[in-house]
């Protein structure tokens, strides 16, 4: 089976996909990321003792802002009028990590997977940035698309 990269034209050059003739549908994507850290670092965040302030609130806002700016940082992404962006951060002390889940929605001609992935990634990077003075060996891991709905390719759920 041949798979074609939609962002590469017949000449092998990168280009933005033409979505002019695509149908407008309800689209949604959910992505995740994890930030693994020492128990002591997580405790500082959860106890509100971090010297830079509320780490989760800052990461949540950063993720939302990033989703809205995805087309500015991912070269071939279409600028989208997102109708919903949600970023949820959940501490998992039993695993010494924070789970980040983002959701993006719109009614449009192209999907919101990159926006959801960008939101989760930037929220994770923000946690790293705010905590790097305390711990430099944190690990951002498992950044992935969990689910997407809408559009020609239909429903996708990560295994």
Swiss-Prot record:
Any GO MF annotation of the entry: GTP 3',8'-cyclase activity
Listed Pfam families: MoaC
Pathway field: Cofactor biosynthesis; molybdopterin biosynthesis
Record GO biological process: Mo-molybdopterin cofactor biosynthetic process
Residue positions of the active site: 129
Keyword Lyase among record annotations: yes
Lyase listed as a keyword: yes
InterPro entries for the chain: MoaC, MoaC_bact/euk, MoaC_sf, MoCo_biosynth_MoaA/MoaC, Mopterin_CF_biosynth-C_dom
Catalysed conversion reaction: (8S)-3',8-cyclo-7,8-dihydroguanosine 5'-triphosphate = cyclic pyranopterin phosphate + diphosphate
Residues that hold substrate according to the record: 76-78, 114-115
Keyword terms of this UniProt record: Lyase, Molybdenum cofactor biosynthesis
EC number(s) stated in the UniProt entry for this protein: 4.6.1.17
Top-level EC class as recorded in UniProt: lyase
Domain of life: Bacteria
Family stated for the protein in its record: Belongs to the MoaC family.
Function: Catalyzes the conversion of (8S)-3',8-cyclo-7,8-dihydroguanosine 5'-triphosphate to cyclic pyranopterin monophosphate (cPMP).
Subunit relationships: Homohexamer; trimer of dimers.
Protein name (Swiss-Prot/TrEMBL): Cyclic pyranopterin monophosphate synthase
Species for this entry: Psychromonas ingrahamii (strain DSM 17664 / CCUG 51855 / 37)
Name of the encoding gene: moaC
């Amino acid at each position: 089976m041949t798979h074609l990269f939609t962002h590469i034209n017949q000449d092998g050059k990168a280009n933005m996909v033409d979505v002019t003739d695509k149908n407008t549908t309800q689209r949604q994507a959910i992505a995740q990321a994890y930030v693994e850290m020492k128990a002591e670092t997580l405790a500082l965040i959860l106890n509100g003792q971090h010297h830079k302030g509320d780490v989760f609130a800052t990461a949540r806002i950063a993720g939302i802002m990033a989703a809205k700016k995805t087309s500015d940082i991912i070269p071939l992404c279409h600028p989208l009028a997102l109708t919903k962006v949600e970023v949820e951060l959940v501490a998992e002390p039993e695993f010494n990590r924070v789970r980040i889940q983002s959701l993006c929605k719109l009614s449009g001609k192209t999907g919101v997977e990159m926006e959801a992935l960008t939101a989760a990634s930037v929220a994770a990077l923000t946690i790293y940035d705010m905590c790097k003075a305390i711990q430099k060996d944190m690990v951002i891991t498992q950044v992935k698309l969990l689910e997407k709905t809408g559009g020609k390719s239909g429903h996708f759920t990560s295994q």
